[in-house]
Amino acid sequence: MGQKINPNGFRLGITTDHVSHWYADSNQPGQRYKDYIREDVKIRELMSKGMDRAGISKVEIERTRDRVRVDIHTARPGIVIGRRGAEADRIRGELEKLTGKQIQLNILEVKNPEIDAQLVAQGVAEQLASRVAFRRAMKKAIQSAQRAGAKGIRIQCAGRLGGAEMSRSEFYREGRVPLHTLRANIDYGFFEAKTTFGRIGVKVWIYKGDLTDKELAAQQAAAPSSRGRNDRRGGGGGERRRRPNDRNDRGGRRERDSAAAPQQNSAAEANNAEGGK
């Protein structure tokens, strides 16, 4: 299952979080759950149009009663902001027109774009659209990710690779990419390259390491703790009652048996002596 499912959805609540934060319990038109979902899709489509060179990694949306907060994670914040903030003002105006609410626009810079799966997939797709050989583009992205500190990376391209008549898929992998390990921090990205031969899909998995014991302990502390067996029985948590065949008592039993053996032998000799008389 880990080989097929989207890694972000598979690890939701463990290493990943929702990209939309809001709650809908109204039946009024425009405030229903499906309305918010449709609006989120339109917002993300608006961010993707005309922003091919901006390197947008993800868009997070948070809603309140009369305001919508949009966080744009990008590798090139200067392109999104524009000269003197003109581009940011244009985006804010289009979002307010789309949602009809006040927009709080936050533009955040991606510190290490070489190990951001979405940006890596977008970079490989741009090279494929520029007629770069797909194997060369994939290997170059893998080398850049490993130099940036990735513990494992896998890149897959599918489509009419190299202009072939029949479509196929090829992938390259370096390092470990444990897709079944839930505590593994795996970033996933997908992008489509529009070439003269058709569309080529690019998928990227980047393994950044496991959650530390400290992080797991913090999660377990946040979860409701269950009582122990002694608490359920009403005991004070003392030592458990030993049974005759307890393994932990075998050493002491052997010592007691060896100490009692000479006494038994002396008693048997005394009885034999009396019988001989």
From Swiss-Prot:
It comes from the Bacteria. PROSITE patterns: KH_TYPE_2, RIBOSOMAL_S3. Residues 43-111 form the KH type-2 domain. GO terms for molecular function: mRNA binding; rRNA binding; structural constituent of ribosome. Residues 217-277 are annotated as: Disordered. InterPro entries: KH_dom, KH_dom-like_a/b, KH_dom_type_2, KH_sf_prok-type, Ribosomal_S3_C_sf, Ribosomal_uS3_bac-typ, Ribosomal_uS3_C, Ribosomal_uS3_CS. Pfam families: KH_2, Ribosomal_S3_C. Disulfide bonds: none annotated. CDD domains: KH-II_30S_S3. Part of the 30S ribosomal subunit. Forms a tight complex with proteins S10 and S14. Binds the lower part of the 30S subunit head. Binds mRNA in the 70S ribosome, positioning it for translation. This is Small ribosomal subunit protein uS3. It comes from Kocuria rhizophila (strain ATCC 9341 / DSM 348 / NBRC 103217 / DC2201).
